[in-house]
Swiss-Prot record:
Signal peptide region: none
Record lineage: Bacteria, Pseudomonadati, Chlamydiota, Chlamydiia, Chlamydiales
Any one GO biological process: DNA-templated transcription
InterPro entries attached to this UniProt entry: DNA-dir_RNA_pol_insert, DNA-dir_RNA_pol_RpoA/D/Rpb3, DNA-dir_RpoA, RBP11-like, RNAP_asu_C, RNApol_insert_sf
Protein name (record): DNA-directed RNA polymerase subunit alpha
Assembly and oligomerization: Homodimer. The RNAP catalytic core consists of 2 alpha, 1 beta, 1 beta' and 1 omega subunit. When a sigma factor is associated with the core the holoenzyme is formed, which can initiate transcription.
Gene from which this protein is expressed: rpoA
Amino acid sequence: MSDNSHNLLYNKFELPESVKMSPVEGAAGGIDKVARFVADPLEKGMGHTLGSALRRALLIGLEAPAIVSFSMTGVLHEYMAVEGIIEDVTNIVLNLKGSLLKKYPLQDCEGGRASQKLRATISIDASDLAAAGGQKAITLGDLLQEGTFEAVNPEHVIFTVTRPMQLDVMLRVAFGRGYTPSERIVLEEREMNEIVLDAAFSPVVLVNYFVEDTRVGQDTDFDRLILQVETDGRVAPKEAVAFATQILSKHFSVFEKMDEKRIVFEEAISVEKENKDDILHKLVLGINEIELSVRSTNCLSNANIETIGELVIMPEPRLLQFRNFGKKSLCEIKNKLKEMKLELGMDLSQFGVGLDNVKEKMKWYAEKIRSSKNTKG
């Protein structure tokens, strides 16, 4: 347990209150397969930092189930044909690779992370063939007769039967990440004539991110991160982003343990959470009405900053541009504002105040407050 005396005070970081998710117009599959996520405001540079990290984690880190092997009555190896089935085994293998299954390996879920064998018996008689016009398509949904997996594309055709027959089919399903070629897949208790498949485990099809400029109050030097995620349906985009975030947090925690010193961040002050009248009474105060050193007061006076409102709307970097305004004066002013539950770079737009009109607005509000006091008196 670290001592609080080792904590380091850091200036606040602008963070989004939430991440906004929206559908992508014209995208097939709707929001369950394609979604756009917008996070703003972020500190300059954080848009690319987070976007790149999330993109890599989404593409390489997420797990999903996939069919890794199968066996079927009459099938001895991959390079053969089966009498009464249109597709040869090579094409059946390709169709199985296009099968999409979903199920999460929760700790309390039957089977957990171990591979599972799903067995099905397909019985096709003459009446089935007649009803299907002589060719009966066997779909992924037909093969999922047991187990706890759900087909994302149940109508996906695996093979087509042209004569009455009965087939026993076994599908082995496992969990993994990324893409694993068949020669790297290890099967426990492999059955005779069980054919191993290449497995595409990753449920994420495409990830793009963009970074735009955005503003906080009058300061435009912030990032907006736009992340667009497309999945194959085994995992929804919203889940994918949440899982990728947890994966990154897990890895970053290893580096966090290197030092016991903890960072304590100053919190951003939300005008919405404060009483507006109280805020206004503070904003109209003159700089000479608060206890600042002569040096800091003179620096503000030389910059033509006369009221607290004119001060707090000013971004920190802009203050440092004023002549003779140094880090010592900045630190003193920030501490004084913190005592007043104010800060630099505040958004005063709800009061109709911006950098271009702050001086006039402060005079107007000061007069309004004086008139209100006189009326009450």
